Amino acid sequence: MPLALALVLLCGLGGPGAWGCLQCDQSVLLELRQLRDAIVTKRFHLEGLQARAQALLLSMEGPFFRDYAMNAFVGKVVVDQLEKVATSFKNQAQYIKANSKTDVPLLEELVSFREHAIKELKGALRDYEMKACDHKTCHSFKAEVLDCLYCKKTMPKCVKKKYCFEDGQFRMTLKFQDDNKPRNMVLVGDLVTVGLAILTFLVILIAACTYRQNRKLLLK
């Protein structure tokens, strides 16, 4: 199927660079592939729904969780916590594979499946970030940690404050746009607002002058 091939290429499957966090666990990848093989063509009867389900599952096999971990958080997680997330993820995948839902209800369940996985992964990522960003205690933080970018186990390290918590949104902004663009957009918005205000004032002024001229003509 050409669409499926294009999606595979788009998601960059098959290379270690596409792995991250949950995908570092080969059993998670295997479970996702088996789920995709079991439901996409057999339980979705419309081509549009097949394409959406295929894209959703392939994104989870690809860099989706890695990008989330790196852009919204510092990209590291305690191994023990990640193993719990992975176990829950695989159990949910097996449940979806075994139930009898089809078409739209099944697609909705896949969306909920991904949302639940994000929620659980977020808890593990945030827990590590809170400990690594606490400079009073981070030096004594001991645990086996996984680097979600390289799929390598490492030791926890203190994280600079500029990379912690509220700055996570700033990291996401940097990924998708230059720093100057938001400022330029604000400037353009201000100029448009001022321009519209001036135009409105001129329209009112012209209308008032026209009214006075017409009134004078009527009174003559």
Curated annotation (Swiss-Prot):
Note one Pfam family from the annotation.
Answer: IZUMO
List the keywords (alphabetical): Membrane, Signal, Transmembrane, Transmembrane helix
Q: How does it sit in the membrane?
A: Single-pass membrane protein
- Extracellular membrane side: 21-185
Subcellular location(s) of the protein = Membrane
User: Residues on the Cytoplasmic side?
Assistant: 207-220
* Region forming the signal peptide: 1-20
Could you name the Gene Ontology cellular component terms for this entry?
Answer: membrane
Q: Which residues span the membrane?
A: 186-206
Q: Which InterPro entries match?
A: IZUMO, IZUMO2
What PANTHER family does the database record attribute to this sequence? Answer: IZUMO SPERM-EGG FUSION PROTEIN 2 (PTHR47745:SF1)
Quote additional remarks.
Izumo is the name of a Japanese shrine to marriage.
The family annotation for this protein states:
Belongs to the Izumo family.
- The molecule here is called Izumo sperm-egg fusion protein 2
Species this protein is from: Mus musculus
